[in-house]
């Protein structure tokens, strides 16, 4: 899996995203010369299962207890990826997908 980045910027900020998890990787404040957000250090670290740092959470955000839920009287079972629970979309949530960039404009990146 290849980690690709995209950058948009204005006179104040430079924003870098990654295709893995449609992740927000860097929000760099130009005059203060500092990255304003937490990331995993290297974009290559996003290849491996990690915390959802900057990544798109989904299909839902948060934990589903015991990896199961009901709709009406029907019980559904999910894969467990956080002890006995399902976290942030399960084993292959949105944070693990390789997203295709469909538009890069001066002020937006769309995956």
What are these regions (language model features)?
Residues 1-111:
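Surface-exposed acidic/polar loop and edge beta-strand patches at domain peripheries
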